[in-house]
């Protein structure tokens, strides 16, 4: 079985980090190949730099799409964000498989009638336990850990959206809509070394205690491969 996955790239990795870690599409490819292991599923990837206005000529070029994170906010008045919201609505209307990550999670809500805003609780950083609420069996019942890096949160849901999980500061940390959209506020594509270097570069943005706790949390293993396997299974259904 082959799955063609379009990666909708919504940002560029900081140049000094990209040299070591690659761009976001490479991180997702690494994650999903590792999660796929030695199964009989063949994964094919194509990147579309949506932050530069690049899109597939036809939605059905791909079997599924992943919408990456971004330093931008979905509520910014930028032409590329407006165009991206329109594309998300098109995917939804066609019931095309879409997995949204961080900014992508927020864009799904924003584009389909929900709301994302700056979180009153401030930054969500570091490895955080993510607790399923058992609304479906999609995530199972056991808490899992992901690396987080966000200041915005989804605060209102589009009609029909089901909340799958939450963290200590993020009530809407994972969602699903129908059988074709899945989203996570956390970053399954992030690994500790990259998060460590990213937080260090951005440390002046963070309150000292949040930064300190986030850096310490990176000593805790996260469940990237668990979520990566979920993403593959979701895309193949």
Label each PLM-derived region with a short phrase.
Residues 170-237:
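C-terminal and late-domain segments of enzyme folds
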Residues 68-135:
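Cysteine-nucleophile active-site neighborhood
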Residues 17, 76-78, 109-111, 158, ...:
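Short glycine-/acidic-enriched loop or helix-start segments at secondary-structure transitions
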């Amino acid at each position: 079985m082959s799955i063609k996955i379009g990666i909708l790239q919504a940002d560029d990795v900081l140049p000094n980090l990209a040299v070591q870690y690659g761009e976001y599409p490479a991180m997702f490819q690494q994650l999903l190949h590792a999660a796929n292991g030695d199964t009989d599923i063949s994964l094919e990837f194509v990147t579309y730099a949506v932050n530069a206005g690049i899109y597939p000529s036809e939605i059905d070029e791909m079997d599924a799409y992943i919408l990456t994170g971004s330093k931008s906010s979905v509520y910014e008045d930028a032409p590329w964000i407006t165009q991206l919201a329109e594309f998300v609505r098109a995917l939804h209307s066609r019931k095309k498989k879409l997995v949204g990550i961080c900014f992508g999670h927020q864009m799904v809500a924003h584009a389909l009638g929900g709301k994302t805003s700056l979180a009153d609780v401030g930054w969500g950083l570091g490895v955080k336990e993510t607790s399923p609420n058992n609304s479906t069996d999609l995530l199972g019942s056991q808490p899992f850990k992901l690396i987080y890096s966000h200041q915005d949160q989804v605060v209102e849901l589009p009609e029909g959206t089901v909340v799958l999980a939450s963290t200590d500061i993020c009530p809407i940390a994972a969602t699903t809509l129908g059988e074709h959209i899945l989203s996570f506020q956390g970053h399954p594509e992030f690994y500790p070394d990259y998060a460590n270097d990213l937080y260090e570069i951005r440390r002046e943005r963070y309150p000292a205690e949040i930064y300190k706790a986030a850096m310490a949390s990176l000593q805790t293993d996260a469940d990237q491969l668990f979520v990566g396997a979920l993403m593959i299974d979701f895309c193949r259904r």
